[in-house]
């Protein structure tokens, strides 16, 4: 029987960030702050692939396609790696494709995206695979990865600030501040993406850019 297990990810409530934003944007409704925060995290995740989910999949005899859906209100951005898993050792990575039309080729293992959903095709039955996914939050997300607060707090806040200041006809509206925070967010995304590729060896990326007043 097929077995799909998602590794647990440490989480924190959105309030950890919302408390800071509500102090800065005192006239903003809570729902607007929450929406801006989720949108900012999703943008950052798409640009950097810093939000990951690890899946262990054991294939079932006669079944070729497997749908991988994170259980924590996350959407899959991309499959980052797939390896055969033997206890504590990995073999791979395996060949990956992005078109279901290619699924008849002679490669042993194929991964592709079908209608916006991640599908895993593994002809070898009874084999366990370790799959790493890049993900982003959906609108229903009520918690976020604790790594965002530990490593990318200012990046997330700057992303939310850029969206909030860009809103028209608000007491706090300021295109100048919105553009400044957007540039700061983009610089932070570039740094975070490099840090993620290096395995977070450079340490936390917090408050690397000056605040905008």
What are these regions (language model features)?
Residues 1-19, 31, 35, 39-46, ...:
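Internal mixed-charge
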Residues 22-28:
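The Skp1-binding helix-loop-helix core of N-terminal F-box domains in SCF E3 ubiquitin ligase adaptors
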Residues 36-101, 150-165:
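Divalent metal-cofactor coordination and adjacent catalytic microenvironments
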